[in-house]
Design a protein with these regions (language model features):
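C-terminal scaffold of the Radical SAM
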Residues: 1-5, 9-278
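An alpha-helix initiation/capping motif
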Residues: 169, 280, 307-310
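Short amphipathic alpha-helical interaction segments
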Residues: 276-291
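Minor-groove-contacting beta-hairpin "wing" of winged helix-turn-helix DNA-binding domains
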Residues: 301-306
């Protein structure tokens, strides 16, 4: 209620995530969804963990405003799941996906590749096992090691080994090949959808559509201004839930960087016309990558990263930002 005044237009998408919303009491979920006007939104997504998908939860889903479910499968190999501290088994993930498919035709499943001990054969088994469930949408991410996390500490202690880049590239190639064969559109670096089932909510981030984030650690982008809430609950409560603890007014350079980083994540790509004063520098950088095939032009003349280069796109993005 304290931030309702920031919503100048009707809410088009709602996304309950950033944690484990599926572990909340359905009555609380109903209150949250009602407060944000979810019943009027075109897309309402909730993130779930396989272990939270019970008969009662599925029953609640069927009568709620939620019309899209995103579930973290991560792997269909028991040892790999245990290695990254996941609570569910492969069997539980498969059963949960089948339960959810009974109440929604818009099911998104998440996978991770580059897991400790994972080889190409194991990755293919997980990938094909998930595709056999025919989800409307698939997200697949390369495992990252973030400072301060359990995985980071284990790697630093020599208890696990990070997958070599050459293996990650092979895994990504297998992913692109399998999803294309199954009829999915590869519309963003890590996202694949059946026709008509792209994530509207996530696409709004990549299109720089304004969004409001609620809860500890949530980010917002409103009126060209970025803000993010304190990540700790006491700090969030002290800020009154307003998200005004930290505010960043973007410079022209930062707006250009945002445009590059978001647009070049997608198959739609970047229009040079949107680059403003940085257009000449952007075109110069693009020519080098167009020449070696790392980038290509769409039929509409938009610039995008070639699918085979998406996994190493960070290097390309840095070149554009530094141009």
């Amino acid at each position: 209620d304290m931030r309702r005044g920031e919503l100048t237009e009707p809410v088009s998408t709602v996304y309950l995530g950033g944690g484990t919303p599926s572990s909340l009491d359905p009555r609380l979920l109903d209150r949250i969804l009602a407060a944000v006007g979810a019943e009027r939104a075109a897309e309402v997504t909730i993130e779930v963990n396989p272990e939270d998908v019970t008969d009662s939860f599925v029953s609640w889903l069927g009568q709620s405003p939620v019309n899209r479910v995103s579930m973290g499968v991560q792997s269909l190999d028991a040892a790999e799941l245990k290695g990254v501290g996941r609570c569910h088994t492969p069997e539980r993930a498969i059963d949960a996906a089948r339960q959810l498919a009974r109440v929604t035709d818009n099911l998104s499943l998440d996978l991770i590749f580059g897991l400790p001990g994972q080889d190409l054969a194991s990755w293919r088994r997980s990938l094909h096992g998930v595709l056999a469930l025919s989800p409307a949408h698939l997200s697949a991410y390369l495992l990252s090691y973030e400072p301060g996390t359990r995985l980071w500490a284990m790697r630093e202690a020599g208890k696990i080994t990070e997958s070599p880049e050459s293996l990650a590239v092979e895994m990504y190639g297998a992913l692109c090949e399998a999803t294309a064969a199954a009829g999915y559109e590869h519309y963003e670096i890590s996202n694949y959808a059946r026709p008509g089932f792209r994530s509207r909510h996530n696409s709004s981030y990549w299109d720089l559509t304004p969004y409001l984030g609620l809860g500890p650690g949530a980010h917002s982008y409103m009126s060209g201004r970025r803000s993010y809430n304190p990540s700790d609950l006491p700090g969030y409560l002290r800020a009154g839930g307003r998200g005004f603890g930290i505010i960043e007014d973007e410079t022209d350079a930062e707006r250009f960087n945002d445009l590059v980083v978001t647009a070049l994540r997608t198959s739609r790509g970047l229009s040079f016309a949107d680059c403003g004063q940085r257009r000449a520098a952007g075109e110069k950088t693009a020519r080098r990558y167009l020449a070696d095939g790392a980038m290509e032009l769409t039929a509409e003349g938009r610039l995008r990263i070639s699918e085979s280069s998406w996994l190493v796109s960070d290097r390309i993005l840095v070149d554009f930002i530094d141009a």
